[in-house]
């Protein structure tokens, strides 16, 4: 069984505006500890990098997968902190195998996330896009829907599988936490 420990962030200055605009209970999730806020009206990546650094001290993080089209500065900063960062494509080639595996593991009840409401909401927002060859990848049908956490889970699952965690035990017992 794979144990998932998700973390999510939102800018604190516009959380109320986002609640009204998106009709999503970000404020409730923040009060319940399922969503973290960062100072200002945009996500403060320095805060997240520090958070990841602290996780690295607590867990044995082997590597961090990232979308190579949007995380150049954070990737460089995390490398500077000593983390191994691995580029991960968002197309069918890279996303299809772990997406299919996540679907299989979910049906087998081998993914545990403790009922995390933010991750559950993002998973519910996924629309599975299929190419002519039968490859699949996550997509979203509406621009207001968020699927970032679901995509991060798929990327982390791929890295966990490639890391050789096939014994059915907790991934944390073998190699620590993957953070994306």
Question: Which ranges hold each PLM region?
Answer:
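RNase H-like, metal-dependent nuclease domains and their acidic two-metal-ion catalytic environment used
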Residues: 1-90, 96, 100, 113-180
């Amino acid at each position: 069984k794979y144990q998932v420990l998700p973390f999510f962030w939102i800018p604190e200055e516009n959380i109320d505006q986002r609640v009204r605009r998106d009709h999503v209970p970000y404020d409730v999730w923040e009060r319940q500890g399922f969503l973290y806020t960062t100072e200002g009206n945009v996500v403060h990546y320095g805060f997240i990098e520090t958070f990841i650094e602290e996780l690295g001290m607590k867990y044995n993080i082997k590597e961090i997968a990232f979308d190579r089209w949007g995380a150049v500065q954070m990737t460089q900063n995390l490398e500077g902190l000593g983390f191994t960062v691995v580029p991960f494509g968002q197309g069918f080639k890279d996303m299809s195998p772990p997406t299919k595996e996540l679907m299989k593991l979910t049906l087998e009840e081998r993914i545990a996330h403790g009922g995390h409401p933010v991750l559950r909401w993002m998973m519910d927002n996924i629309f599975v896009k299929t190419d002519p060859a039968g490859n699949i990848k996550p997509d979203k049908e509406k621009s207001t829907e968020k699927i970032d956490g679901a995509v991060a889970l798929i990327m982390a699952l791929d890295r966990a599988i490639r890391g050789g965690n096939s014994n059915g035990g907790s991934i944390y017992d073998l190699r620590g936490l993957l953070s994306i």
